[in-house]
């Protein structure tokens, strides 16, 4: 029967030694001519075999189950001084730019009258969520990363930090999802959707986004799935059920909705492009009506001039709709693309981690986790600049605020809007046609 050591585990080394040493001794006696072992061999052979068995039996601790805090839990990286300066500068720059960009959005919409419309309330909600990430989350992650990954802010604040991180990031993602739905309805239902697009409706949508984001935050605080938190680690709960629920609600469902909305807008833009080819209008020819009665001829030409005016208005409307659809498709495509590139690696890692490492800790290399996390945070940085790039009013307001030109911002926006409307009203290739036919109609009207 195998011996058991003081820890209650089988004494593998002692068992092997008791079996092998007597057999080796008898073998040596058989090899000796006089039936006895050589004195030198008898003296060193047991020690040699003992050393061999100690080496070969040294993996015996594999009988022990690995502790819960091994395989990456509490992993730390010791950065040099230069590395700390470089990493700290990059993380600080990301944080400050995120704060500045989202503050510009909030100030622009709240203080510029033309921008205070219900459709922009969603952009303000997005900016507030991204601003919360920059103020309440990024600084603590930056400090933790600079000291090598060790959590130093205590057990209580770990739960508060995770709650803020999850809620703000989820609110940002879900607001992007609602914005995509808003853009889709604005394009596909231009006549009916603006009626429902009022302040109360937008307020309810924004409130729903934040409540749903909070629903992901609350379970670990009320005992469903405890966060991983000790002296070194502050990690969101790795419970299988909670991981699937939180990642699905916070990312996979919103991403699916955004992709579907983008596809629908893209399809509408292509359909509009095929429909509105604008082949041109027939010219008004004085000789087109031949009649012996001059009154009938004049009446026909007046009707053609009236038809020309209606056709011009219809073409301008079609051009406006077409350009709006194309702009919405381009904007939403860039938003969805940036969102996917920033957040997809992090959520794939978060979903797979419990199944790879178990529920007690993380075995993923720290640098991989932090890279994916900061890539997701970068989405909060680029959102304000994406909207400013495609929104002329926001772009003009940004420029005025950065140049400290606070007066007459609304007047500048109105003038820029009128200039853009006049610019898009008539395409250059139709200007000659419009002038020729307008002169002809004006001449006929003067002759009457």
From Swiss-Prot:
Membrane topology: Multi-pass membrane protein
GO CC, alphabetical: axon terminus; dendrite; neuronal cell body; plasma membrane; postsynaptic membrane; presynaptic membrane; synaptic vesicle
Intrachain S-S bonds: 158-234
Keywords: Cell membrane, Disulfide bond, G-protein coupled receptor, Glycoprotein, Lipoprotein, Membrane, Palmitate, Receptor, Transducer, Transmembrane, Transmembrane helix
Residue spans, topological domain Extracellular: 1-86, 144-155, 223-240, 356-366
Lineage: superkingdom: Eukaryota
Positions glycosylated per UniProt: 5, 69
Binding residues for serotonin: 165
Tissue spec: Thalamus, hypothalamus, and the hippocampal rudiments.
Keyword Glycoprotein: yes
Lipid-attached positions, S-palmitoyl cysteine: 404
Subcellular location: Cell membrane
Cytoplasmic domain ranges by topology: 112-121, 182-201, 264-329, 391-448
Transmembrane segments: 87-111, 122-143, 156-181, 202-222, 241-263, 330-355, 367-390
Gene Ontology BP terms: adenylate cyclase-activating serotonin receptor signaling pathway; behavioral response to pain; chemical synaptic transmission; circadian rhythm; detection of mechanical stimulus involved in sensory perception of pain; dopaminergic neuron differentiation; G protein-coupled receptor signaling pathway, coupled to cyclic nucleotide second messenger; long-term synaptic potentiation
InterPro entries from the UniProt entry: 5HT_7_rcpt (IPR001069), GPCR_Rhodpsn (IPR000276), GPCR_Rhodpsn_7TM (IPR017452)
Family named by the database record: Belongs to the G-protein coupled receptor 1 family.
Name the UniProt record assigns to this protein: 5-hydroxytryptamine receptor 7
Organism of origin: Rattus norvegicus (Rat)
Gene: Htr7
């Amino acid at each position: 029967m195998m011996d058991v050591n003081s820890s209650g585990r089988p004494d593998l080394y002692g068992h092997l030694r008791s079996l092998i040493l007597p057999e080796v001794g008898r073998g040596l006696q058989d090899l000796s001519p006089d039936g006895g072992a050589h004195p030198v061999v008898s003296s060193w052979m047991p020690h040699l075999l003992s050393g061999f068995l100690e080496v070969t039996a040294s993996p015996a601790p594999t009988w022990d189950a690995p502790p819960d805090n091994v395989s990456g839990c509490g992993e730390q990286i010791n950065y040099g001084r230069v590395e700390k300066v470089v990493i700290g500068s990059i993380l600080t720059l990301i944080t400050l730019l995120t704060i500045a960009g989202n503050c510009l959005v909030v100030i622009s919409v709240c203080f510029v009258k033309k921008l205070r419309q219900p459709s922009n309330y969603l952009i303000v909600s997005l900016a507030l969520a991204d601003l919360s990430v920059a103020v309440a989350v990024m600084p603590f992650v930056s400090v933790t990363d600079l000291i090598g990954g060790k959590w130093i802010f205590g057990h209580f604040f770990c739960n508060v930090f995770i709650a803020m991180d999850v809620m703000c990031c989820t609110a940002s993602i879900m607001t992007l999802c609602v914005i995509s739905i808003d853009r889709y309805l604005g394009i596909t239902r231009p006549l009916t959707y603006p009626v429902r697009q009022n302040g109360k409706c937008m307020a309810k949508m924004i409130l729903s986004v934040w409540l749903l984001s909070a629903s992901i935050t609350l379970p670990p605080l009320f005992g469903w799935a405890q966060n991983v938190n000790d002296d070194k680690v502050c990690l969101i709960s790795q419970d299988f059920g909670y991981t699937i629920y939180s990642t699905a609600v916070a990312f996979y469902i919103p991403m699916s909705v955004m992709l579907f909305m983008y596809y629908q807008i893209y399809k509408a833009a292509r359909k509009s492009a095929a429909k509105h080819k604008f082949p041109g209008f027939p010219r008004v020819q004085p000789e087109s009506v031949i009649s012996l009665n001059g009154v009938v001829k004049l009446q026909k030409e007046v009707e053609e001039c009236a038809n020309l005016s209606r056709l011009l208005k219809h073409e301008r409307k079609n051009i406006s709709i077409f350009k709006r659809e194309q702009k919405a498709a381009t904007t939403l495509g860039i938003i969805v693309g940036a969102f996917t590139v920033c957040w997809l690696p992090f959520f794939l890692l978060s979903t797979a981690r419990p199944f790879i490492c178990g529920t007690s800790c993380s075995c993923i290399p720290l640098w991989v986790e932090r890279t994916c996390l900061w890539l997701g945070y970068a989405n909060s940085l680029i959102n304000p600049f994406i909207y400013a790039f495609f929104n002329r009013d926001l772009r003009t307001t940004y420029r005025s605020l950065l140049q400290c030109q606070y007066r007459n911002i609304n007047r500048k926006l109105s003038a820029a809007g009128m200039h853009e409307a006049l610019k898009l009203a008539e395409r250059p290739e139709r200007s000659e046609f419009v002038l020729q036919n307008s002169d002809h109609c004006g001449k006929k009207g003067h002759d009457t």
